Regions:
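S-adenosyl-L-methionine
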Residues: 1-35, 39-48
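Class I S-adenosyl-L-methionine-dependent methyltransferase module
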Residues: 42, 47-123
């Protein structure tokens, strides 16, 4: 089953996903070191049996977005809904940039359920 990525991502591998899965076959485990929009994983063919899937990314806000989508999708959708004025957009971007860094990653690493749905929607 193929799922659409919930957001566009520069450098995404959506178009390459079928080629990648033909090359990989049907592994029981899959680790994505640079998840981005997770287009490859979301386009994984149906798999029978046990499987382990892991996505990673160095961008703390991206990790927060995936965690918030998993744990609190309705709240993320609420904050992602528009319309947004240009001033709001720039204010949100500045807010996110001011909070990006080692502290964000430490917060996410310190609690497997830590997430900020508002930031995920804004991101």
């Amino acid at each position: 089953m193929s799922l659409a990525a919930p957001f566009p991502y520069f450098g995404g591998k959506r178009r390459a996903a079928p080629i990648i899965w033909r090359a990989l076959g049907d592994p029981g485990g899959y680790v994505e070191p640079f998840a981005g929009s997770a287009a490859v994983l979301l386009n994984r063919p149906a798999h029978k049996g046990r499987r382990v899937e892991t996505i990673n990314d160095a961008d703390g806000w991206l990790v927060n977005a995936w965690r918030a989508i998993k744990l609190n999708p309705a709240e993320v959708a609420k904050h992602a809904a528009g319309p947004v004025t240009e001033i709001d957009y720039h204010a949100r971007l500045a807010w996110l940039q001011d909070r990006r860094g080692p502290e964000l990653v430490s917060w996410l690493e310190g609690d497997p359920e830590a997430h900020d749905a508002k930031a995920a929607g804004w991101w």
